Amino acid sequence: MLNKAEQISEKSESAYVERFVNAGGVETRYLEAGKGQPVILIHGGGAGAESEGNWRNVIPILARHYRVIAMDMLGFGKTAKPDIEYTQDRRIRHLHDFIKAMNFDGKVSIVGNSMGGATGLGVSVLHSELVNALVLMGSAGLVVEIHEDLRPIINYDFTREGMVHLVKALTNDGFKIDDAMINSRYTYATDEATRKAYVATMQWIREQGGLFYDPEFIRKVPVPTLVVHGKDDKVVPVETAYKFLDLIDDSWGYIIPHCGHWAMIEHPEDFANATLSFLSRRADITRAAA
């Protein structure tokens, strides 16, 4: 029988298991499904973000072919919220520590949305010995002006109405927002420890003027990279995708129409199939070169 830290979710056609691991002293929650080469999914940095709400419709598709691990980032979901400065360096360190703690047999592929994409990118540059491939989806990491559509995220006021505004900013205009999504994200966001961590995270981003790297750092990405972007992304404009493609030598692009910042939520099958196609192609090339 599974203990409470290994509860099976039956919310999707392929069950995933919730587990926890100590990653560099940070108790870290993750969901796991499938077998094979490991693929790590990393959610974005909006209030109330966590692995299940962001990836529940993608996990079962990817898990038909891979061992899928969807983690809660430092300060989000059910992962611990230590009293630290929530910088990008700390998020990179946490992801590195998580990968090491999982004791994977070989390298991992990283799939990240927004802040999660930027964090995966950082690990791929600084710890390339751990990473096989990278998927950036609506990724942060390049300079984006803190414009009006970012304000519901950066200045989230911890009200339910504010959560509705946040989700509207993150999705395309035709996306139907349901109460279950709002209620779940609002519950996570207003947890006292999560709230404190989120305020610290957004304060750091405001002080830095955004979440970005020097372009020369991005040029150092050494692994094959798929850049996925919603054509109607209001938070990180689609032009950013082309900048990533220009900077990362071994990169492919996939633009999804009628899609905002959340391809994995707005168009989960399209996004998952594009990711599978990319990962399988990379595996074929790797086998041919062996």
UniProtKB/Swiss-Prot annotation:
EC numbers, comma separated: 3.7.1.13
Reactions mediated catalytically: (2E,4E)-6-(2-aminophenyl)-2-hydroxy-6-oxohexa-2,4-dienoate + H2O = (2E)-2-hydroxypenta-2,4-dienoate + anthranilate + H(+)
Record annotation: effect of changing residue 114 to A: 40-fold decrease in reduction in hydrolase activity
InterPro entries linked: AB_hydrolase_1, AB_hydrolase_fold
GO BP, sorted A to Z: carbazole catabolic process
Residue numbers annotated as active site: 114, 233, 261
This protein's pathway: Xenobiotic degradation; carbazole degradation
GO molecular-function terms, A-Z: 2-hydroxy-6-oxo-6-(2'-aminophenyl)hexa-2,4-dienoate hydrolase activity; hydrolase activity, acting on acid carbon-carbon bonds, in ketonic substances
Activity response to pH changes: Optimum pH is between 7.0 and 7.5.
Keyword vocabulary terms for this entry: Aromatic hydrocarbons catabolism, Hydrolase, Plasmid
UniProt cross-references to Pfam families, sorted A to Z: Abhydrolase_1
Thermal dependence of function as given in the entry: Optimum temperature is 58 degrees Celsius.
Subunit structure: Homodimer.
Protein purpose: Involved in the degradation of carbazole, a toxic N-heterocyclic aromatic compound containing dibenzopyrrole system. Catalyzes the hydrolytic cleavage of a carbon-carbon bond of 2-hydroxy-6-oxo-6-(2'-aminophenyl)hexa-2,4-dienoic acid (HOPDA) to yield anthranilate. CarC is specific for 2-hydroxy-6-oxo-6-phenylhexa-2,4-dienoic acid (6-phenyl-HODA), and has little activity toward 2-hydroxy-6-oxohepta-2,4-dienoic acid and 2-hydroxymuconic semialdehyde.
Family: Belongs to the DmpD/TodF/XylF esterase family.
Protein name in UniProt: 2-hydroxy-6-oxo-6-(2'-aminophenyl)hexa-2,4-dienoic acid hydrolase
